[in-house]
Amino acid sequence: MSFEINRNILIAVDESENAQRAVTYVGKLLGGIKGFKVAVLHVISEPEEDYFQSESDKDKWYKEYRQQVDQMLEKYRNILIDTGFDPGDVLVRSTIRYCPSMAECILAEVDQTEYSTLVVGRKGLTHKEEFLFGSVSGKIVRTARNCTVWVVE
């Protein structure tokens, strides 16, 4: 019996060094191996409606933040290409969502796409902080279904 392995990988990122390490890890591990497709995703957590004084303030914030995110995603894309991924096999994208939990938003993206592996960086929390506040990667590991999760230290 043979079956086709889904080689689509989603890397959920933010601006942290841990996220960059996750991207670099995937690049060094799989770059140059044919058949893998990688998407780098940044979820922009939409602020509460009353966070901004006006709609124009919200638009200005979104435009400026989107520019930062686009630069970050391009940097991560280049890391993957420089480590051997074909440019056509690397997708970067951001999405804005209302996120009561960032982990839930990331897992919703996995559920809506064809990615079988989710890669996240481990947040640099102490054990005490992680116990008190939890972590995105910890919640993803506990609640992910129908995908493999890699947590990069």
Cite the ranges covered by each PLM segment.
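Short, well-ordered amphipathic alpha-helical segments that serve as non-catalytic structural scaffolds
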Residues: 22, 72-77
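Structural beta-alpha unit
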Residues: 1-4, 81-117, 138
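A short acidic, glycine-rich active-site loop
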Residues: 58-71
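Small/aliphatic-rich secondary-structure junction motif
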Residues: 2-59
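A generic secondary-structure signal
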Residues: 25-29, 79, 108-109
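Gly/Ser-rich helix-loop-strand patches that form or flank binding pockets
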Residues: 110-153
